[in-house]
């Protein structure tokens, strides 16, 4: 079963049958339109490419426009690809949120909020150094980042200050609380990566 591309609407809460408040993220999943079907013979692997939403005509490049026209679908806000195994798809086919009707848990992938350049305390949860007792300059600095003559360098991958966020993040095994096919909404328990209105990819959970 493939996944779908949606839009993070925001968070709210609903009450279950026992009256317990459940925090949920609302994901709007409009119909995903098939723009290309990749086959083993032509592409070396099997996959389906989809788009969703819409894009202003003056924002669509000529190569994109030709691609959408060939598929016979309206220009969407992006292109995403899902590997397939035995499933049959046709150009222009629409795939809706109701494919998750019988799914218990999903994996959600999004782009995390960008935080810019951050220090080691915020980025890697380093502990701070002493606030007093003679420390006047090094409260939030990293401390030692290597040794001396041996090895005489800083190892690659050392946790240091740098750019935080704005990267692809996947949260696994989120419980599907509700599928509202009429309003094209999927409610999952807990939070998902990214800002409001950000694109998210929803797939059946790998570890479910």
From Swiss-Prot:
Pfam families cross-referenced by the UniProt entry: Ribosomal_L3
Recorded GO CC terms: cytosolic large ribosomal subunit
Keywords, alphabetical: Methylation, Ribonucleoprotein, Ribosomal protein, RNA-binding, rRNA-binding
PTM field: Methylated by PrmB.
Keyword match rRNA-binding: yes
Modified residues (N5-methylglutamine): 149
TM regions (residue ranges): none
InterPro entries, A to Z: Ribosomal_uL3, Ribosomal_uL3_bac/org-type, Ribosomal_uL3_CS, Transl_B-barrel_sf
Record-stated family: Belongs to the universal ribosomal protein uL3 family.
Assembly with partners or alone: Part of the 50S ribosomal subunit. Forms a cluster with proteins L14 and L19.
Function: One of the primary rRNA binding proteins, it binds directly near the 3'-end of the 23S rRNA, where it nucleates assembly of the 50S subunit.
Protein name (record): Large ribosomal subunit protein uL3
Species in which this protein is naturally found: Haemophilus influenzae (strain PittGG)
Gene that specifies this protein: rplC
